Amino acid sequence: MRCGRKPGWRRVFRCPLDTAKAVYRSPGLVKGVSYRPSRRTRIVFQARRMTAAQRQSLLPAAEGKTAAVSDLTEKERAEVLETAYQYVQYLYVAEDIELAEYRRRSFALLSARSRLQVPAGAKEEKPVGRTPFAAHESMRVSVGAGSRNGNAFQEFAFRPAYHSLEDDDFGLLPGAEINFLNLRLRRYDRTDKTVLNRLDVLGIRSLSPADELFSPLSFTVSLALAREEDPATGREGYVLNGSVGAGKTVAAADNLYFYALAGVAGGYGGFLPRNQYAAIELTAGLFAGFDRLKLLAEAKKSFSSSSFAERIRYRAEAGMPLAKNWSLAAEYFFDDNAGKDNDEEFSVSVRYYF
C-alpha cells in the first residue's frame, strides 16, 4: 500500500503521525475515529473537577482510609471513592503497589461505595480531545532575519521532523517536543558570508506537570553541531554539543508550566581549549501554551571545566500560529559569559509546515 502523496525524498523523513494521517486520509480505509482517554487522563480530569475538600480526601481514600470522606455529601463521597478506586487500579497496573495491597484498598473502597445511596451514573469523561489528524504537518521550513552582537543576518532553516514547543500544539501533547535534523543556514551582512549556523541532530524535551497524584519526570536530551564564538579569544568554530537533564514541572494553570532541571553537558571542537569541555547545568523556566501564543522563557547556569562554556544563558522563544501550517516566531538569547564579552542575539521568522 502506498500511503500518502509525499514524493520519494520525503518518505525518508516520515514519522509515525505522517503514516497515521495518510491512512486516515485514504478513501475507504477508516470508517470512524473514537477517542479513548487513558485511565490517567480520566483520573486527572475528575480530580480537577472536585472541590478542595474532595481533593484533600482523595489520596487518603486511595490508601484505604475511607473515613477521610465522612465530612462530604453522599454525592461527593461517591465521586471521591470512584476516582480513588481508578487511581488504585492505575497504581497496581503500574506495579507501584503489590497485589495484596491492591486487594485491601479495593475492598475498602468498593465496600464504602456500596453503602452509599447514590446510583452509579455515567462517569463524566474528559471531553473529546483534539484529533492529531488535524495537527500541523511534520516538516518545517522558515525564513527570517535578526542580529547577533550587532551583526545583521538572514536565515534559512529546514526541519524534517517533528514539533517544537513554540509550534501550534493543536492535536499534539502540550509541553513536549521532538526536533530532528533541524538545519540553520545564515548569511551575515558584515562578512557577506553564508555559513552553517546550527544543526540540531536531535532535540527532545518533555515538560510533564507533577501533582499530588502523579509525579512524572521532565527531561531534555540534545545533540547539536553549532557555530560558536569563544568569548575569551573571539575565534569562531564548530562545536559538537550534547546534553541531558531531568527535573520537575508544575502547572500553575492548564496552559502555564514552571519547570526546573539539572543535567550534564559536554562538547568537542578543534578551536576549544583542550578541544573539549564538560559542564553541569541548572535550568529554570516557564512555558505558556495559549492557543494563539506559545512562549518559552528560561535561564540556564553552566558550571564548566572550560571558560568557553562558563556562562548564564537567558533565552526566550515565542510562536504565534497564523493558520494550521503557518506561524510567526521570535527568538532571543543573552549569554553572560562570566566577565568576558557577552553574546546577544535576536531573530524573527515566518514558518511553513508541509
Model-derived regions: residue spans:
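Structured, non-membrane catalytic/scaffold regions adjacent to prosthetic-group chemistry
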Residues: 1-35
